[in-house]
């Protein structure tokens, strides 16, 4: 328990003692909130608890403050003052501040982290881009936000699992195989019509080139079906590996990579059976429909088409059912803003399956616009396609990119200034932070050069300068 928590408990104990001694009437004490005063002269902590509890006890705030202060048992306080109508200002003893700093140094990067709680179990799913091409800057924003959210929640003690949903089933993967196949045949001198919904990126050509470099025309005389089956697996494996490499370079890592393929057909059939059994799915015109209007959607949704092929919604229902079956108490999805209309139908499906739809929270990610020299950057100079995450990392660095991505609220469009992200000036917040860190490191370097060694038990009481004490208190204000 840190000093702040100890002080809050001491205030609660003082109020309880005042009530027991009938100095205050019976009543439920409001939540005790401590704040750091705007001026150092007003103490290390301040509380308006006396004013907050005046309407509970029906006693003047200053009188309540006096009863609290007179019964306060806190040996770590130098003094306590009552100000104005009933503010209480608390002043810590110097040795308490030094002890807290020693604990901070001992804790290192773990300082401020709260103890891990086993429950609730929370899952955060983010990025989940189709493995059909490189990640672009929009994916980068989702990756930075999701990663930061998971890190913060873990530091706050939450039991969090991060997950990437691999869309490795369905038409987009078929189109990936068709695209690689077309480029493979073209490179081997065959005339072929490029698929209508194929992927035109340079990365597809490079994949085909690598296949030829490794295996030559080995697949040329195979049937289209056999060749497409092989290319689907080769391309998927390569794209997924590249995707993981880009995310690792961005310092983004996942606990679970969940394959959509594992849901077909058993899990999809199972949720359809559940929904049919509980009356929340019906058959019409040969298709299976979810009664999503019963749960707030604007119309019922097709889950299985009349030709027996599942819609995207079918796999998503099975996937989210699987999440709850894994005993997660809270699901957080980070989706692109273009999925806005999809939120209601997935929540409706969860409610139809008997889950609490509020246990699924969807955060929508707005667009990112890149600017260079004041001009909107629409295409990559290198590829003529959308700017990829790896290109952004190469240009401004992973740290700067992550910093800029999470500087703005997720629900507002982000204008990413490439020049600012690279500038070495105080206008660039990343440079400002990195420069401060570099200056701190230089102090340790100069100490080493001067033969001054650090010790595990420094004499912190030598830190008496006003600026030093102010800096220590600033450090101790976290979290």
State where each predicted segment sits.
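Short, charged, solvent-exposed linker or helix-capping segments at domain edges/interfaces
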Residues: 99-104
